[in-house]
C-alpha cells in the first residue's frame, strides 16, 4: 500500500520542517514540502496537512494573520471540508485560528484569540511574554478528533511561544465546552488539571492546549509534538495516520455560532494634550507587508505605521517647546 502523502505547509519564517518530516516518516507517512506560493492545485493530491510552527511573515501585524489570508489557506478550507486531517502546530495553530478553520463556523469567521501569554498563580500575574519549557498535556475523553488516541495518557511536550493563550467570549465558551472542542489540556505528569502556572504555562482558558473543529478533522495545538525525543507525542501522529487509513465516511459539520461584529470608534484626542506622531525614516517592513496583503485582497490602499504619543502637563510647562526638543534629539 502506498504511503499517505502529508503536505507540511511552509510560509516565509516557518521552521521545524525537519522535525515534522522525521515524525511523519517514523509513522509510515510520506512528507511533502509545500510552499505558500506553490500551486494550490497540488493540495488536492495530498491525504493530509500540517501547518508548521515558526514565525510566518515574521509575525507582522499579528501572529498568523497574514498567512491566514494567503490563497493556499483558502484551498486548505476546501480540503478540510472533504474530511482531510489538518494539524496546525504553534504558529500553524495561530494560522488556523485566524483563518476560522478552528473552531470553524459556517463562514469560517475568526472566533477565537491566541493572545499574549499570562502566567498566573491565583490572582497574581507572575510572568508574561515568550516562554519555553517542557510541559504535560492530556487528551479530552469526549472530544471527537483525528488526533486523539482512545484511552490516551498524558504526554510530555515542549512549548515555545509568546502568544499561546486561548481566549474566547462567554457565548463561544459555552459552545466550545458543550461540544468538547478543547482537544488537549495542560496537566501535570499524573494528568491532574490546574489553571495555575506552572501546570498551565500561558493562562489559556480551561487550560486549553489544543482546540478542534466540530467535525474533528482540524486541530490547532500550541505545544510542539513534533519536537519530542522519546516517543512522548506519538499518539497524535499515530492517530492521524489511523484516521486516514480508516477511510471512514465523513460528513463535515460547522459550528453553529455567528460572531458579533464590533464597531470601532473613531479616535478623538483629548483637547488638553499635544499629539506627536512618529514614523520610521527607514523602510517599515510591517506596514509594507500589511499593504501588500490587503492589496492582494482587492483593497487598494497605502499603509503607513505611526506611533502615537500624547503629552500632557499638570503645570505651566511649555509643551510645544518640549515637542521641538524631542524632534531635534
Task: Mark where each language-model region is.
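Flexible, low-complexity inter-domain linkers and amphipathic docking helices that mediate domain-domain
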Residues: 1, 271-276
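N-terminal beta1-alpha1 cap of cysteine-dependent amidohydrolase-like domains
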Residues: 1-103, 122-127, 131, 205-206, ...
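Amide-donor transfer/coupling interface in amidating biosynthetic enzymes
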Residues: 38-39, 45, 78, 112-266
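A short alpha->loop->secondary-structure connector
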Residues: 103-114
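Short, surface-exposed ligand-recognition loops at beta-strand->loop->(often short) alpha-helix junctions
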Residues: 277-286, 314-316
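C-terminal non-catalytic interaction/assembly regions of soluble proteins
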Residues: 292-299, 323-325
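Short Gly/Ser/Thr- and Asp/Glu-enriched loop/turn motifs at secondary-structure junctions
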Residues: 303-309
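Conserved small/polar residues in nucleotide/adenosyl-binding loops
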Residues: 327-329
Amino acid at each position: 500500500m502506498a504511503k499517505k502523502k502529508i503536505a507540511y505547509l511552509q510560509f516565509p519564517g516557518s521552521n521545524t520542517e525537519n522535525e515534522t518530516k522525521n515524525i511523519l516518516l517514523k509513522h509510515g507517512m510520506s512528507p511533502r514540502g509545500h510552499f505558500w506560493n506553490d500551486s494550490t492545485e497540488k493540495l488536492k493530491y495530498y491525504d493530509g496537512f500540517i501547518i508548521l510552527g515558526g514565525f510566518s511573515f515574521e509575525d507582522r501585524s499579528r501572529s498568523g494573520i497574514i498567512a491566514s489570508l494567503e490563497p493556499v489557506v483558502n484551498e486548505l478550507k476546501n480540503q478540510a471540508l472533504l474530511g482531510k486531517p489538518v494539524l496546525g502546530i504553534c504558529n500553524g495553530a495561530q494560522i488556523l485560528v485566524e483563518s476560522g478553520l478552528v473552531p470553524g463556523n459556517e463562514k469560517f469567521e475568526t472566533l477565537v484569540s491566541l493572545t499574549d501569554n499570562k502566567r498566573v498563580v491565583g490572582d497574581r500575574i507572575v510572568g508574561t511574554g515568550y516562554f519555553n519549557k517542557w510541559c504535560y498535556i492530556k487528551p479530552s475523553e469526549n472530544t471527537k478528533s483525528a488526533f486523539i488516541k482512545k484511552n490516551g495518557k498524558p504526554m510530555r511536550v515542549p512549548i515555545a511561544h509568546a502568544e499561546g493563550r486561548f481566549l474566547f467570549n462567554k457565548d463561544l465558551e459555552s459552545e466550545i465546552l458543550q461540544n468538547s472542542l478543547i482537544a488537549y489540556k495542560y496537566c501535570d505528569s499524573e494528568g491532574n488539571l490546574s489553571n495555575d502556572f506552572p501546570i498551565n504555562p500561558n493562562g489559556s482558558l480551561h487550560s486549553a492546549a489544543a482546540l478542534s473543529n466540530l467535525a474533528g478533522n482540524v486541530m490547532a495545538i500550541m505545544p510542539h509534538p513534533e519536537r519530542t525525543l522519546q516517543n512522548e507525542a506519538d499518539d497524535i501522529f499515530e492517530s492521524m495516520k489511523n484516521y486516514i487509513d480508516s477511510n471512514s465516511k465523513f460528513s463535515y459539520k460547522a459550528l453553529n455560532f455567528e460572531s458579533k461584529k464590533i464597531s470601532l470608534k473613531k479616535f478623538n484626542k483629548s483637547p488638553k494634550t499635544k499629539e506627536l506622531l512618529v514614523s520610521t525614516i527607514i523602510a517599515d517592513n510591517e506596514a509594507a507587508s500589511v499593504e501588500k496583503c490587503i492589496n492582494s485582497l482587492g483593497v487598494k490602499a497605502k499603509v503607513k505605521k505611526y506611533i502615537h504619543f500624547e503629552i500632557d502637563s499638570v503645570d505651566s510647562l511649555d509643551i510645544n517647546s518640549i515637542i521641538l526638543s524631542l524632534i531635534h534629539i
